[in-house]
């Protein structure tokens, strides 16, 4: 009987009490998030996960400066366009920065074979050793190495040519068959570049090479091609009706590359022993270089952020937040900002 009376008293006390609010405190937050089912849901607390700002500059990455090509393209830099001479002393970099419309590329018109693949290969290179693969003064005693210049590659108002290639021409009225080889003893991949000249008429062919039926052969363990010059009149480009087609290969350590020709060879002068590095890359950007250091570089500018996501640019180099297309990305750390009231 006493137990029943106690229950009744408790029930009476509860119904006579004030209204009880069950839940959490609302606040003045205007944070909104999108959920799977709803958009613009107001919540009490949330944190931003998305970085949307940059400094608009090219910066060093972890203290290492980039290779800024300026008015030179990848082609102009690696072939040795004389207008890119200031870049030849650069041996290491954190990344390569190229402008969208570089003026100095292939100064003598022609086709650059597998150019995009070469860019891809160079994007993983963080340093190289530029060295004479075939020294100019001693490698070609039966050919002229000083007359192969052109107004298309002029430098300081004078006809010139690529600094990494040699245009071999006749000597004393003849162009003897040549055969030259190089063994890669660098213990690294070596990038070798060369060209094949295609004159615009048979008169130029005879005058420069003293042969009408020329060929160029290039052979290594992984490369084997024979080139035949195509003599034809073409529209003038940079004042030239002739063309030079450019080629390259990667030579593995201890491998041998052999060049044979009886004319029309644009011979390698300098080659590059490559060192690949994690985190290197190539970006195309109009941003200017600044005295700054960053962990993440984009074509728009550098990002210094600890946030996990960014929407600045999909192309990044370094330790970067993951790119997303979203304009807003927040993580909810609270609840809906709507009070819930129940009466008992």
From Swiss-Prot:
The keyword Cell membrane does not apply. Its main location: virion. It is a single-pass type I membrane protein. GO terms for biological process: clathrin-dependent endocytosis of virus by host cell; fusion of virus membrane with host endosome membrane; fusion of virus membrane with host plasma membrane; virion attachment to host cell. InterPro entries: Capsid_hemagglutn (IPR008980), Hemagglutn_HA1_a/b_dom_sf (IPR013828), Hemagglutn_influenz_A (IPR000149), Hemagglutn_influenz_A/B (IPR001364). Residues 1-17 form the signal peptide. It is found in: Virion membrane; Host apical cell membrane. One of its GO terms (molecular function) is host cell surface receptor binding. GO terms for cellular component: host cell plasma membrane; membrane; viral envelope; virion membrane. In natural infection, inactive HA is matured into HA1 and HA2 outside the cell by one or more trypsin-like, arginine-specific endoprotease secreted by the bronchial epithelial cells. One identified protease that may be involved in this process is secreted in lungs by club cells. Glycans are attached at residues 27-28, 40, 71, 104, 142, 172, 286, 304. It comes from the Viruses. The keyword Heme does not apply. Keywords: Clathrin- and caveolin-independent endocytosis of virus by host, Clathrin-mediated endocytosis of virus by host, Disulfide bond, Fusion of virus membrane with host endosomal membrane, Fusion of virus membrane with host membrane, Glycoprotein, Hemagglutinin, Host cell membrane, Host membrane, Host-virus interaction, Lipoprotein, Membrane, Palmitate, Signal, Transmembrane, Viral attachment to host cell, Viral envelope protein, Viral penetration into host cytoplasm, Virion, Virus endocytosis by host, Virus entry into host cell. Major glycoprotein, comprises over 80% of the envelope proteins present in virus particle. The extent of infection into host organism is determined by HA. Influenza viruses bud from the apical surface of polarized epithelial cells (e.g. bronchial epithelial cells) into lumen of lungs and are therefore usually pneumotropic. The reason is that HA is cleaved by tryptase clara which is restricted to lungs. However, HAs of H5 and H7 pantropic avian viruses subtypes can be cleaved by furin and subtilisin-type enzymes, allowing the virus to grow in other organs than lungs. Binds to sialic acid-containing receptors on the cell surface, bringing about the attachment of the virus particle to the cell. This attachment induces virion internalization of about two third of the virus particles through clathrin-dependent endocytosis and about one third through a clathrin- and caveolin-independent pathway. Plays a major role in the determination of host range restriction and virulence. Class I viral fusion protein. Homotrimer of disulfide-linked HA1-HA2. Belongs to the influenza viruses hemagglutinin family. This is Hemagglutinin. The lineage of its organism: Viruses, Riboviria, Orthornavirae, Negarnaviricota, Polyploviricotina. The gene is HA.
């Amino acid at each position: 009987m006493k137990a029943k009376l106690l229950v009744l008293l408790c029930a009476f006390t509860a119904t006579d009490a004030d209204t009880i609010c069950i839940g959490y405190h609302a606040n003045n937050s205007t944070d909104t998030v999108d959920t799977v089912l709803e958009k613009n849901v107001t919540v009490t607390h949330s944190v931003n996960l998305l970085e949307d700002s940059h400094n608009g500059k090219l910066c060093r990455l972890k203290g290492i400066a980039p290779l800024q090509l300026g008015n030179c393209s990848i082609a102009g830099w690696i072939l040795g366009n004389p207008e890119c001479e200031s870049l030849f002393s650069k041996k290491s970099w954190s990344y390569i920065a190229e402008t969208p419309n570089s003026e100095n590329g292939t100064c003598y018109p022609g086709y650059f074979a597998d150019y995009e693949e070469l860019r891809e290969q160079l994007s993983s290179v963080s340093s190289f050793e530029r060295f004479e693969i075939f020294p100019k003064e001693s490698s070609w005693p039966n050919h002229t190495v000083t007359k192969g210049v052109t107004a298309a590659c002029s430098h300081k108002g004078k006809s010139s040519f690529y600094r990494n290639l040699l245009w071999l021409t006749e000597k004393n009225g003849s162009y003897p068959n040549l055969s030259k080889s190089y063994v890669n003893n660098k213990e690294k991949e070596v990038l070798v570049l060369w060209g094949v000249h295609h004159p615009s008429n048979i008169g130029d062919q005879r005058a420069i090479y003293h042969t009408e039926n020329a060929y160029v052969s290039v052979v290594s363990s992984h490369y084997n091609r024979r080139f035949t010059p195509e003599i034809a009149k073409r529209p003038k480009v940079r004042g030239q009706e002739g063309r030079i087609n450019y080629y390259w290969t990667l030579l593995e350590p201890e491998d041998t590359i052999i060049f044979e020709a009886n004319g029309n060879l644009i011979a390698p002068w300098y080659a590059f022993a490559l060192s690949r590095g994690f985190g290197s890359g190539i970006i195309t950007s109009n941003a200017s270089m600044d005295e700054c250091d960053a962990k993440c570089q984009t074509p728009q500018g550098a990002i210094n952020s600890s946030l996990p996501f960014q929407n600045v640019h999909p192309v990044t180099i370094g330790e970067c937040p993951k790119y997303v297309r979203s304009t807003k990305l927040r993580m909810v750390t609270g609840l809906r900002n709507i009070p819930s009231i129940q009466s008992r």
